[in-house]
Structure formats: C-alpha cells, structure tokens
UniProtKB/Swiss-Prot annotation:
Belongs to the peptidase M14 family. This is Carboxypeptidase Z. The lineage of its organism: Eukaryota, Metazoa, Chordata, Craniata, Vertebrata. Cleaves substrates with C-terminal arginine residues. Probably modulates the Wnt signaling pathway, by cleaving some undefined protein. May play a role in cleavage during prohormone processing. Disulfide bonds join C48-C114, C56-C107, C98-C134, C123-C162, C127-C151. The gene is Cpz.
C-alpha cells in the first residue's frame, strides 16, 4: 500500500509549482462530468524542442513539441497538470505494478515524440496490450483508467504509422541478442547487460513464466531509472499465508557488477527450470516468494560500464549519482542497539528511525529499499558484492566505535553463521585451498566472517534489516574482480548457482505458524520470543510469522497486548526441508492488558520518525479497502486534494 506522507509531500511540492506558474487549465473539461478533455491536438508538422521532463527522462526519444495532445503549451502547464502529477505517483498507487511501462505510455501522450519537424503518435496495440494487463491493478484500488490513455483517441493504428513507446524498454531481441536456432530452452547469454537490456531480459522472463513470475518497480534512482524487481511465486504479486519471502539484491555499489549479472542469470534459470519440470525448482517456487533486484544502483553502473571491465573500475561508479555510498546511507540503528542492550527490560528489536536521520542526505535508492522491506514481510536476504571472496554477516558496526576490527555478534549469531555457511560451504572457490585469494584470506575461517570483525562501518543495509524488521541479511563477496570481463561470467555463474539455491532454501529452516485469538481471528503485530535470544520477530497482518532458528531445543513464546502469553518447546533437527508448523492461540486477559517489555519507540520517544514509511502492519489488506463506503471517495483521493480546482475527477468510478 502506498505511503501517505511521501505522496502528499510530492503532490504538495507540485501544487506549489502549479500556483506559482498559474497556467490556464490544460484543457477544457467540457460538459462531460468525468472532466475529460474534449479536443485532441495532433499536428503533422511541428517545431521540435528538447524533452525536459524528469518523469519522462528515460523515454525512448529526446524531442517533443507544443501544443501537446492535451493542449499544454508550455513546460509549466505540463508539470502542473493533474495528468503529469498522476504519472509521478502512479508507481506508489499501484504498488509498483505496470511500471515503468504505464509511466512511459503516459509520457508518449503528455510529451509526444517529435522528429524531423513532425510529431508521431504512439501505437494503439501497445496501449491496448498494457490496458489489458494493468486493468486489474486499477480495479483493485477502484480507480478508473486515465482518460488520456484512451487507446482509441490518443493512439494510432499501425497502418497510419505509429511507434512503440515501450520499444527501448521491452522491445524485440536486438540483433546481437537474438538466440541461434536449435539452442536448448535453458540457454542463457553470459554477457554484461546495459540497463535497457537488463529490463528487457527481466520482462521477457516474466512474460515467459507469467504463471509464476512478474516484474515490478520499487522506486527510481536519482537519475530516474526504475529499480526493477522480478519475483517468483505460485501466486505472483501477492503474499500467501505462511509462505516466506526472500530477497536477493545486487549492484548496491555500481562498479560491483558480478551480483547484477548473476541475478539476471538466476531469473532466467528459475524460469527455464520451472518450465522443464525440475522438481527442486518447482518445489522452491511453489513454497517461497522470491524477489530479485539485480541493480540497486543503476546510475553508478552506467559510470562503471563506461570505464569498462577489469581492475581499472575499482572505485569509479561505486556511489550513486549523488556521490553517496548506498551501503553507508541507511540509518545507524546499531549504535542505538548497543545503548539499549545495556539496559534490562527494554526491547532491542524493531528499532525506529531517528528523526535526525532525515536531516541528512538520504538517497532515493535507499528510501526505495526501506519502503520495500517495511511493506513486505521479508524473512531472509542477501546482498551481493564484489572485490573479495567471503560471506559476512551482522553486525557490521563494532560494539566499540573506536575499534576498526572487533567481533560484534548479534543475538542470532548461531543462525547467521548457519546462513553464511549455507552459501560458502557449497561454493567451490570459497572452499578451494589451492586458490590464490584476494584481499584477506578467509579460508581458515571457512570463508565466513562477522562483518565488524572484518572492518567496521555504520549505515549498512544488513544491520538495518535485522534491527528494523524481521529480516536476516548476509553480505556475499562474489570474487576478487569487481567488474569481471565477459569471458569470466559463465564461470562466475557456475560457482554461485548452487550456493544461491542452497541459500534460498534456508528460508525454510526454523518454525512458522499462525497467531490467532480463541475465535480464530489473526493477531497482527504479536511478538514471537525465543528464550536465550534477545531478538523478537512480529506477526504479519494476517497473523502469520516465521522464525529462523538453529538446530536444538528452544522455548518459544507468543504474546500480544491484552492477551495471555503462550509458551511452547520446539526442537529443530540438524536437517530440515521445511519449517516446522507451530501455531499459537492467545486468550484475552480478564484483568486488562499485561505489562510487556516496552518497545524502543515507547522507551525513546525522541526516536519516532516523522517521515516513517508505514509498514505492511499499518495497513489492512488491500481487499479490505477496495470498495469505498457509499458516497465516499476512494482512499487514494486524498493524494489529489491539493490540486483544486483541477482535481482528476476522471479517475473516479462513481
């Protein structure tokens, strides 16, 4: 579900621009109560001007013309129009579905393509195909299809001459990408992929395996590139009860490209093997929801790719376009954890974000990741890097801030070591004693290390995952060369294929279950405690939970305000292919709420985040919001209240 503060802020800023420019209405609504524009303006001859719209920066053309089909006659008129504002927030409203396709389709109307002194219309069949695919997403939030994406009015048939506005995004195979005939269906092209090529491969893969895969965007980079994710699940696009969620992230540093390519290959492999009936892959996709983000830093990658492969790109492109190191840009919750851990009776998990964090420079890529992990109940994660050959795990920040190297374990040290070993133990190069190692030689440690014991730093993504959410994340250094040459990519994939699959299967280690009241109603945000491990997980909105646990006997407790706590003993075997099912039924207290350990937000009110991205726990399931009450507006209408008098009433169904 989209976040109200973020969208209101964005729309408020755009509304200020509208008031300052005070343009005339972009079109006359006419007598139609829907507020649709009644006149179309498409000229065959026009004066082409450079395209200067941030939302349309990645369009497949560089020139447009005025007036536009919606009668906009200046950049100010376009940028202050409700149509343009919708394109800026549609990603959030639809939770990443159909983007960037939908945004680029809208750009083709708001800023028509102009070449050689002539405007060109987008193709009708492209619009019709996208509408068919995306209409369910609009229906899910009770939003009408935007009038300016009317396929019959604003788009041209092929016989009249038109262009595909999505060609650069998901177009046909390039000549150099075309696969030779006779190749097996598992063929993967082991080469570096540009941003456009990466998106095309992911979208083609999702289309090929549409029953178990889909793509979506979690946000945009500083330069406007969508952060595209491909997910695999038996029901893609939705969380299934008690199905664990796992994510793999590559290219957080733009010049560390091995993880980017490996995840692109993994997506194709999962799709192909599923279609071929591979029982291991089918079991994995039918019991797990897997999210792959090959490139968290596409802007930095472009800088590194321009310099080329090899050691010469050791630092070029590491940061994002704002010159920020994204793996140092997350809130420093580890320092707060060390402070809390010294106090008995205070929770040290789900630590809120300090308001001071937002006073600094926070990258849009970082914000996108934070919103993502606050929205989806991830259980397990790995961040893929390059430059060494080792698997590290939290904490990454030393418990003594003056020590650059100091063993600093989490309460889940045993589990994190198991996760790290699940990757390293089946990686042939990490276990090869004859291999010349790069950087530090971690073979004596089993090619795993506590992050702070390697080198200490703050603002890392792994520590943030663990201390702010239920998610356990490790960091994998895939090899010595950050930007390997193409001839090394096949070997890189072969070395990491089995470790990746083995790691994904680790999400099923431990226990899972439901927490309900005596009537069977789910208890959301209930706490799952394990005696001897000072780190709790919480239930999702539907009452389901997952708790990664090492082998052994554990006392597990479920509790929630207003209910009596329930305690159970569980035994985790050395080997297990699926998590043990442990349900809890909580009974209400007869004498009022019991005193529980205070959470960090109650113990530390100064750490409440004024710009906090709401988590999934803050929202009812989307199906509960689908139908507005009689006479009321849909929940998303509040996002557009700042646009008076030009509210987009054409988005209302009622």
């Amino acid at each position: 579900m989209p976040t109200m503060p973020l969208l209101l802020a964005a729309l408020a800023a755009l509304a200020v621009l509208a008031l300052a420019a005070r343009p005339s209405p972009s079109c006359s609504p006419g007598p139609d109560p829907s507020g649709k524009c009644q006149r179309l303006v498409y000229t065959h001859s026009a004066t082409c001007v450079d395209l200067h719209l941030r939302t349309c920066a990645d369009a497949a053309y560089n020139h447009t013309s005025f007036p536009t089909p919606l009668e906009h006659r200046s950049w100010e008129a376009v940028e202050s129009s409700p149509e343009y504002m919708l394109l800026g927030v549609i990603h959030f409203l639809l939770e990443g579905q159909c983007n960037p396709d939908l945004r680029l389709l809208g750009c083709s109307v708001l800023a028509p393509r102009c070449e050689g002194g002539h405007t060109q219309r987008p193709c009708r069949h492209v619009c019709e195909g996208l509408r068919e695919a995306c209409q369910p997403a609009f229906d899910a939030i009770d939003m009408a299809w935007p009038y300016f994406l009317d396929c019959a009015q604003y788009f041209a048939p092929e016989e009249e001459g038109c262009y595909d506005p999505l060609e650069e995004l998901r177009g046909e195979l390039d000549v150099e990408e075309a696969l030779p005939s006779g190749l097996p269906p598992t063929f993967i092209r082991f080469a570096h992929h540009s941003y456009a090529q990466m998106v095309r491969v992911l979208k083609r893969t999702a289309a090929r395996c549409s029953q178990v895969a889909k793509t979506y965007s979690i946000g945009r980079s500083f330069e406007g590139k969508d952060l595209v994710v491909i997910e695999f699940s038996s029901r893609p696009g939705q969380h299934e009860l008690m199905e664990p969620e796992v994510k793999l992230i590559g290219n957080i540093h733009g010049n560390e490209v091995a993880g980017r390519e490996v995840l692109i290959y993994l997506a194709q492999y999962l799709c192909s093997e599923y279609l071929l009936g591979n029982p291991r892959i089918q079991r994995l996709l039918n019991t797990t929801r897997i999210h792959l983000l090959p490139s968290m830093n596409p802007d930095g990658y472009e800088v590194a790719a321009a310099e080329g492969a090899g050691y010469n790109g050791w630092t070029s492109g590491r940061q994002n376009a704002q010159n920020l190191d994204l793996n140092r840009n997350f809130p420093d919750l580890t320092s707060e954890y060390y402070r809390l851990a010294s106090t008995r009776g205070v929770r040290t998990d789900h630590i809120p974000i300090s308001q001071y964090y937002w006073w600094g420079k926070v990258a849009p890529e970082t914000k996108a990741i934070m919103k993502w992990i606050q929205t989806i109940p991830f259980v397990l994660s790995a961040s893929l890097h390059g430059g060494d050959l080792v698997v590290s795990y939290p904490f990454d920040f030393s418990k003594n801030p003056h020590e650059k190297k100091m063993f600093s374990p989490t309460p889940d040290e045993k589990m994190f070591k198991l996760l790290a070993r699940a990757y390293a133990d089946v990686h042939p190069m990490m276990m090869d004693r004859s291999e010349n190692r790069c950087g530090g030689n971690f073979l004596k440690r089993g090619s795993i290390i506590n992050g702070a014991d390697w080198y200490s730093f703050t603002g890392g993504m792994s520590d943030f995952n663990y201390l702010h959410t239920n998610c356990f994340e490790i960091t994998v250094e895939l090899g010595c060369v950050k930007f390997p040459p193409e001839e090394a990519l096949y070997g890189l994939w072969q070395q990491n294929k089995e470790p990746l699959l083995n790691f994904l299967e680790m999400v099923h280690r431990g226990i899972k279950g439901m927490v309900t009241d005596k009537y069977g109603k789910p208890v959301k945000n209930a706490r799952i405690l394990v005696k001897g491990i000072r780190h709790d997980v919480t239930t999702a909105p539907d009452g389901d939970y997952w708790r990664l646990l090492p082998p052994g006997s554990h006392i597990v407790i479920a509790q929630a305000p207003g209910y009596s706590k329930v305690m159970k003993r569980v035994t985790i075997p050395l080997r297990m292919k699926k998590a043990g099912r442990v349900d809890f039924i909580l009974h209400p207290l007869a004498t009022g709420p019991k005193n529980f350990l205070p959470g960090p937000s109650r113990a530390l009110p100064r750490f409440q985040d004024p710009q906090r991205e709401p988590t999934q726990m803050d929202f009812e399931p989307p199906r509960a919001r689908r139908q507005p009450a009689s006479g009321s507006k849909p929940w998303w209408w509040a996002y557009f209240t700042s646009l008076s008098p030009y509210k987009p009433r054409w988005l209302l169904k009622y």
